[in-house]
Structure formats: structure tokens, C-alpha cells
């Protein structure tokens, strides 16, 4: 018997919740707690791959999610088409945490990358370049780069000290 891929359905969104939606999921994410997040503007479905249980929670942000970056077991940064939010997942709910330097940054988020050693969040935007939020100083800055009118599509580590930043047509940059 030759090797072949085999797919088994392990979770299906509730039909009554998605029947009138042309795109029932705007974003999906797998966290370090074995949860697969299936997100839309109204609801977050967290399917745990170990317990096989699903938690449905209200999307307290009320916006389409574009990216999620996990900080620790319970804290996340969540990017949307309108901005970025700091949240905590606890007591079977998503709780927004105040963060004035990010809450007042009304930009479309394309990509998030959290650099754990420095505790800095790199924020890739749509046509506004890249921002850096330092969790130690609680400050948000924009690096002195010529990326201020560029869309950032991906941020990935090159090594322990450098990141690669991919853009939508303007090349790949190293920070």
C-alpha cells in the first residue's frame, strides 16, 4: 500500500452559527497551549487538540482578527484591521487589557512577531511600515528605516539578533 495523505475531520463549526456567513473564519492560529483558534468578528472557537474540547467565547474586540502573537500561557497581542489589542485568556473568556501606547495606534495590522529575549513586539502594518512596542518601557516607536509607506507581510527571525522583514513588493529587509 503506497503512502498517502489521510484527513480526518476532528471539529466542525456549528452550522447555525456560520450558515449566513460567506467567510465564517477570518483568521486561524495555533497557540502553545494546544488550542486551534478559529476566529471571526463575533466569536472565537478554541479547539484543544489534547482534550478534544471546544471553547466558544465572544470576540470582545468586535473586529476581524488579522494576526495573533502569544506572549505567555495566557497573554496575547491580537492584530485587527483597525489596530492592535493586548488580551488575556482566562476563566474561559478573552479579557482586553489596557495598553495606551497600542490602543491609540489606529492602523491595519498585517503581521506580529514577539521577540521574547528583548520583550519587544514587532508590528507589521498595511502601508505604514513597521512599529516596535517595548514591553519593558511601555513605549512604541517606528524604526528609522525607509519602510514608512510599505506593507509588511511577514516578520521572521534570521538568528538571535536579526529579523527578516518581507514586504509587499518592496523586497526583504534585515533588522
Which stretches of residues belong to each language-model region?
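Carboxylate-rich, polar loop motifs that coordinate divalent cations or form catalytic acidic clusters
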Residues: 1-175
Amino acid at each position: 500500500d503506497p503512502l498517502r495523505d489521510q484527513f480526518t475531520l476532528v471539529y466542525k463549526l456549528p452550522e447555525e452559527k456560520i450558515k449566513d456567513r460567506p467567510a465564517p473564519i477570518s483568521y486561524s492560529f495555533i497557540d502553545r497551549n494546544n488550542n486551534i483558534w478559529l476566529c471571526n468578528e463575533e466569536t472565537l472557537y478554541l479547539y484543544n487538540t489534547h482534550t478534544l474540547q471546544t471553547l466558544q467565547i465572544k470576540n470582545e474586540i468586535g473586529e476581524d482578527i488579522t494576526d495573533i502573537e502569544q506572549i505567555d500561557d495566557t497573554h496575547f497581542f491580537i492584530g485587527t484591521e483597525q489596530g492592535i489589542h493586548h488580551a488575556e485568556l482566562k476563566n474561559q473568556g478573552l479579557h482586553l487589557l489596557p495598553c495606551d501606547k497600542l490602543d491609540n495606534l489606529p492602523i491595519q495590522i498585517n503581521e506580529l512577531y514577539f521577540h521574547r529575549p528583548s520583550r519587544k513586539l514587532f508590528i507589521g502594518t498595511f502601508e505604514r511600515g513597521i512599529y516596535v512596542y517595548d514591553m519593558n518601557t511601555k513605549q512604541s516607536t517606528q524604526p528609522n528605516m525607509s519602510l514608512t509607506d510599505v506593507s509588511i507581510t511577514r516578520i521572521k527571525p534570521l538568528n538571535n539578533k536579526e529579523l527578516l522583514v518581507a514586504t509587499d513588493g518592496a523586497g526583504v529587509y534585515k533588522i
